[in-house]
């Protein structure tokens, strides 16, 4: 079996890269070869690293049974038009490789991610244009155009929404299997006419042996960024974008700054809202710039610290940094999603502080998950946009440290019972095996 990947991203600075890495290790253990076509990476890389990647256009890794073909593409940047153009040009090149490249033509099945949203339609065209009509497995991590409606970028019935729905239907109709990351996703696409037998639910797992609790006295991030170990920390880890409701988070931090100076917020990541957030905090608060030993820069604005993405090998330190960790979004954004960072929070034995749309996440955090007979509360859930309830949830955990620890232990147990790396990767293996002849 030989698997073809046509991707707009490659490298360790993609949020879900550990999932792909775990999955691909499982594929290699089956004796399956993998062929990748992708643009030269730029996300999270220095100029020197980008130049180096452009020189090394084909990467062979016999141990991992992978061949990665990179084609030259301009850097991603933060401008939305520039990013959209990069995605479009990349998709055109990937289509060309998928149909005509010798290495791609020797593959038996395609495994395609849903990000960016045109990837599925591109893969469907590859399938149609190849004589062998190569089977196409679609991994649905984000539902488009629903996500655009949720962020307020468009509305149902608009021209953009109609185009998005056509792309969505074309993709679903041509996919041989669709892997979704939650029961909510499954219900969503079934309501759009996708037959149930085409859908497989595979939750985004966490490597329970990699993401573990790191005691505060051993957590190196406190020393790297000059954080006071005696404070109560609320952390956010991931994309700092337009949908994460950073405005509300800043309002809550401002309100707690005087009444509860021991509560400190730490945001680890980057994204489209990063520059706006830094400018906003600079205009309101006193800034302290921190130079970490590795050369990276961080900022502290009174009771809010902004740290850059950390290497994956430090993921346990990142998710163990806080006393509690956030899963947060604007209303309407997360109706059908359970962010995979939730599992990392739980695996690190930290309580989940969720301010999110009411969906499967609420059941899991409150301990009412129908998918587990042993589920117990592992945090506090509040409705997306409810600032007062969110602030009250923070104070509840701040005033009851034993409850924090209990929720953390419950979350870790839920992961061990339901969301281990072995369970998730085996489900992917089973899907691929269904296409073996």
Q: Locations of the language-model features?
A:
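N-terminal subdomain of nucleotide-sugar transferases
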Residues: 1-58, 256
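Nucleotide-sugar-dependent
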Residues: 14, 244, 309-318, 325-346, ...
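Carbohydrate-associated surface elements
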Residues: 40, 184, 202-205
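A short helix/loop element that forms part of the nucleotide-sugar donor recognition site in Leloir-type
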Residues: 52-58, 212-227
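Membrane-proximal helix-turn-helix segments that form the acceptor-binding/catalytic region
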Residues: 118-121, 125-131, 158-180
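Conserved donor-binding/catalytic core segment of Leloir-type glycosyltransferases
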Residues: 227-244, 250-253, 266
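Nucleotide-activated donor-binding/catalytic signature segment of Leloir-type glycosyltransferases, i.e.
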Residues: 274-316, 378
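A short, well-ordered alpha-helix in the C-terminal region of glycosyltransferases
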Residues: 389-392, 396, 403-417
